From Swiss-Prot:
Keywords: Acetylation, Phosphoprotein. The modification N-acetylserine is found at residue 2. InterPro entries: DUF2039. It holds the Pfam family DUF2039. The modification Phosphoserine is found at residue 137. This is Uncharacterized protein C9orf85. It comes from Homo sapiens (Human). The gene is C9orf85.
Length: 179
């Protein structure tokens, strides 16, 4: 690129191309990194969700060591990094907890409060699962998905405990399992 005034277009490609994408857990196999990678960013708008995912992807995400002060209720109740509002205030005002704007919330706060599947160990193909809101009888994963999909299709969330932590399969995953 020339230093000539108005000449801002570059005519050659990038000199050094990356052959592999960056992996944030390549050398850091700590428990904290696994928890950060498994974290679900809920209660935020699409843009803030993308920003938080970028921070996680490139090892720029730093978890909070102690709760921060909420800008609405002025209590030390903010437990998520980079958020400015606590969960109750963000839910009440229906705004993004990170930027404070009245945008569409990608993953609402209320999802983790709905009925869940409890796992009695590490999940395999047909591991015993218990559903707290039903008869509490063990069943295979396919039978539970079929049965609960018919009764609680709109509100059920599968919570799978994996080595790294909790992973949520929302409505789209539920439709795939029950179809």
């Amino acid at each position: 690129m020339s230093s000539q005034k108005g000449n801002v277009a570059r005519s050659r490609p990038q000199k050094h191309q990356n052959t592999f994408s960056f992996k944030n857990d390549k050398f850091d196999k700590s428990v904290q990194t696994k928890k950060i990678n498994a974290k679900l960013h809920d209660g935020v708008c699409q843009r803030c969700k993308e920003v938080l995912e970028w921070r996680v992807k490139y090892s720029k995400y730093k978890p909070l060591s102690k709760p921060k002060k909420c800008v609405k209720c002025l209590q030390k109740t903010v437990k998520d990094s980079y958020h400015i509002m606590c969960r109750p205030c963000a839910c009440e005002l229906e705004v993004c907890a990170k930027c404070g704007k009245k945008e569409d919330i990608v993953i609402p706060w209320s999802l983790p409060l709905l009925p869940r599947l409890e796992c009695s160990g590490r999940i395999l193909a047909h591991h015993n699962l218990r559903l707290p809101c039903s008869s509490d009888s063990p069943a295979s994963a396919s039978r539970v998905a079929g049965t609960t999909g018919a009764h609680h299709h709109a509100q059920l969330i599968f919570v799978f405990l994996v080595e790294m932590g909790f992973h949520y399969v929302g409505q789209a995953g539920l439709e795939l399992l029950t179809s």
